[in-house]
Design a protein with these regions (language model features):
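Active-site-proximal loop/turn and secondary-structure-junction residues that shape catalytic pockets
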Residues: 67-71, 91-93, 121-122, 169, ...
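Glycine-rich, acidic/polar active-site loops that bind/position phosphate-bearing ligands
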Residues: 143-328, 337-340, 347-590
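N-terminal hydrophobic targeting/anchoring segments and the immediately downstream early-domain regions
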Residues: 1-24, 141-157, 162
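C-terminal amphipathic alpha-helical interaction region
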Residues: 518, 524-729
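Short, intrinsically disordered, low-complexity segments enriched in Ser/Thr and Pro
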Residues: 107-141, 251, 374-376, 501-510, ...
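Hydrophobic/aromatic-rich, well-ordered segments within soluble, folded domains that form packed cores
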Residues: 80, 84, 88-91, 307-320, ...
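Short linear, low-complexity motifs centered on an aromatic residue
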Residues: 96-111, 131, 229, 236-238, ...
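Histidine/acidic residue-rich metal-binding segments in metalloenzymes
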Residues: 14-120, 124-140
Length: 729
């Protein structure tokens, strides 16, 4: 294995940037070329079929079979101009990845001749085997049938020689087995609820759209070094490895010059993204060595999520052409920053108003304040649900590690906006406002744009931060499907807005003016949610104590956090807003618990194998060298000199032996704990046992191995070290 390490380093020394041939035309000329967008639809579809698609996208109007056949034929004819041979229903099962089954256009015609055909039936619905995808026990293995159904709101696209059609994925009995189905329901719920609130201010608002701008962080590691690390290959993270003498302490990597090989990779990735209509805009070095970030322009949440899933797949494919491997694990390297996926979320009306952006009028700013205050209450009431949406085996290593937001949910507004809310509360008393008081309040609210223009600070330690015209949810992990958190945020916001509107309607029906009712409910909501507002250092120990005093939860136990999907408030949101039914919610919880269990199980098995079959034998080899050295020294020195000169080596032999014994004992105990956990009856019991009884051994074993790495001759150490993984370009 040590030979593999040094062969990898030799191979890496000869790496050169891969040349990327950029098109000679302007970006606008090839942007979206591989997407069946509205422009292509107009060109390849009959006018009645084009209108049917647009009505389906904008109004949800069903597409009949005749129109579906026209659309499918036009889609196929467009795809054939790119020499496409196959099509697939592209969907997002509960695996944090995408799935596809490729079928050819080939069919037999009536006369037995081979033809190429793509029908509306094949476009709209397919039947992939659902038995091998995560389903949380709501389907038996022998009940294999599942359906994929075309999501008309997300355009088809071409990857390699395959036409990819975004779809939802449901069971034979109609239960959602994917991320897209509940995401579309959550977006529909927030659209309806937000529109109702907006129409209190502007009756012209017909729809509200949720937008998302994700920021994808990742590491790049040379493929030769990656292949020499079985833990990276099998778990996505290093289960052992002592920190490098230099890591990120000089802050010299963040926004630094991008290495040439990485630039070539980024160029090709951007090129392929632009062909697929993915509006990637920003690229830069991140904080940790060999860590980078990619970010696009904001889009509709559903499309943005599809694009993020596609980007993660593209990154892996393109990286291999540049002799890199992309690491999307949240914490691939101990001691340096992990990777997240910041979700920048906003709500916009069909009249062009960003509901999280201050307006130019007092009335517009009342709308702004209304939505800001409802976000505060949404997060306050649903802390546990938001945490459940982002917690995982990988992300638990990152959250609260002085590099990422803590497991405590809070909102950062900036002190000026926070002060403005306090001022609103102070001005609103229980008595009816006089005209002068209303005018003073409106003048104060009218100053919001001027106040925020230069005073919207940033707080990188906040998990949910207002950043001027959006909220940035920073707790999501880099490998996660954005839909997991977007489902929860939009569903919870819909639930909160519905409750807010119900409170106002009740007061109005009781005889109160709508404006007075709005002021009253706003004041009550600001006061009720004030504990969720925090402007300080989210990494500090003081904040943990303060959060506890405020009644904010801090759950670091992964299975316990997952089970919060099923508490009373979470059920009120997820089932109450019809995002999930009982079976679907049970399925999500079981799938997340099983995912966690299996990931820890795999890590445990891999570490046990590496410890016993790679590290311990290496330690014994070095120990034998030391013993041979001691025997040689004993032959040439007197007893007194020998004792004096060899004390350090004898201590080292003893140290190595003690660590070997400790590793073997810990691996044995970990294996026994795993056996016990595997025989427990329920998925909840298994997950709790893996968290509490198995997982602690990973750190214990690692600690011994990392000490041995510093003590054993570098020449025989079998695995690439952190200095090689993080600093070789």
């Amino acid at each position: 294995m040590s030979k593999m390490r040094f062969f990898a380093l030799q191979e890496l020394a000869n790496r050169r940037p891969v040349k990327v041939d950029y098109p000679s035309e302007k970006l606008a000329d090839y942007y979206g070329n591989h997407v069946f967008d509205r422009k292509k639809m107009q060109e390849y579809l009959p006018s009645e079929a084009y209108k049917a698609v647009i009505n389906a996208i904008e109004k949800g109007t069903p597409i009949n079979r005749e129109m579906a056949d026209m659309i499918a034929n036009g889609m196929k004819n467009w795809a054939k101009t790119f020499n496409v041979t196959h099509y697939t229903h592209w969907f997002q099962p509960l695996t944090d990845g995408t799935a596809e089954k490729h079928d050819g256009f080939i069919e037999f015609g009536e006369d037995g001749e081979v033809i190429e055909r793509f029908s509306g039936k094949l476009l709209i619905q397919q039947e992939p085997d659902a038995s091998s995808f995560p389903n949380g026990g709501i389907r038996n293995t022998f009940e294999a049938r599942g359906y994929t159904a075309w999501d008309v709101s997300s355009p088809a696209f071409i990857v390699d020689s395959t036409l990819c059609i975004p779809t939802i994925f449901i069971s034979y009995t109609g239960e959602a087995l994917d991320y897209k189905t509940p995401l579309l329901k959550a977006l529909g719920a927030v659209d309806k609820a937000a529109t109702e609130v907006c129409r209190m201010f502007d009756p012209n608002v017909k729809r509200v759209f949720a937008n998302l701008g994700w920021e994808q962080e990742y590491f790049l590691v040379d493929t030769a070094l990656y292949n020499a690390r079985p833990d990276l290959c099998l778990t996505g993270r290093t289960l052992m490895g002592h920190s490098s003498a230099k890591d990120q302490q000089l802050d010299d990597h963040y926004f630094g010059s991008i290495p040439p090989r990485v630039t070539s990779f980024m160029k090709e990735l951007e090129l392929e993204c632009h062909k697929l209509g993915i509006p990637v805009k920003t690229r830069h070095n991140e904080v940790a060595p060999n860590q980078f970030e990619l970010a696009p322009i904001f889009e509709d949440v559903n499309l943005a999520n599809d694009h993020n899933q596609l980007v993660m797949d593209l990154m892996k494919r393109i990286a291999s052409k540049h002799n890199f491997t992309v690491l999307l694990h949240e914490k691939p390297f101990k001691g340096v920053n992990g990777s997240g996926k910041h979700n920048n979320w906003s709500l916009c009306t069909d009249t062009g108003i960003n509901l999280f952006s201050p307006a130019k009028t007092a009335e517009g700013n009342m709308l702004f304040l209304t939505f800001i205050v409802n976000v505060l209450m949404m997060v306050y009431k649903n802390q546990d649900l938001l945490r459940a949406s982002i917690v995982s085996a990988g992300n638990s290593h990152r959250l609260g590690a002085n590099e990422a937001p803590p497991a405590i949910l809070s909102i950062f507004l900036g002190r000026h906006l926070s002060h403005m809310l306090d001022e609103v509360v102070a001005r609103l008393n229980d008595a009816e406002l006089t005209p002068d008081e209303k005018k003073a309040l409106q003048l104060g609210i009218g100053r919001i744009p001027a106040i925020l223009q230069d005073n919207t600070d940033r707080n990188r330690t906040s998990p949910f931060a207002f950043t001027g015209n959006r909220f940035e949810f920073r707790a999501a992990g880099s490998s996660a499907n954005c839909a997991a958190s977007m489902i929860v945020i939009n569903a919870a916001m819909a639930h909160q807005l519905n409750e807010f509107k119900t409170q106002i309607d009740k007061l109005v029906n009781g005889g109160m003016e709508q404006e007075e009712a709005l002021y009253k409910v706003l004041k009550e909501t600001i006061i009720a949610s004030q504990n969720i507002r925090f402007e300080g250092d989210g990494y500090s120990e003081e904040w943990k104590a303060e959060a506890a005093r405020r009644g904010l939860t801090n759950i670091c136990h992964v299975p316990e956090a997952i089970l919060k999907f099923n508490d009373e408030q979470s059920r009120a949101v997820l089932i109450g807003e019809k995002i999930f039914n009982e079976n679907e919610l049970f399925c999500r919880i079981e799938v997340e618990l099983e995912k966690f269990t299996k990931k820890v199980q795999i890590e445990s098995r891999v570490l046990g194998d590496l410890a016993i079959n790679h590290i311990v034998p290496t330690a014994v080899i070095y120990q034998n060298r030391l013993l041979e050295n001691l025997r040689g020294l004993k032959e040439i020195f007197s007893t007194e000199e020998y004792e004096e000169l060899t004390e350090d080596r004898k201590n080292l032999v003893r140290e190595i032996q003690n660590r070997i014994l400790a590793i073997k004992k810990a691996v044995h105990n970990m294996t026994e704990a795993r056996k016990v956990a595997n025989h427990l009856g329920s998925q909840v019991e298994k997950a709790f046992s893996y968290e509490e009884q198995v997982r602690p051994y990973l750190e214990e074993i690692r600690d011994h191995i990392d000490h041995l790495e510093l003590e054993i001759d570098d020449e025989i150490w079998p695995l690439p070290k952190y200095r090689e993984l993080l600093f070789t370009k």
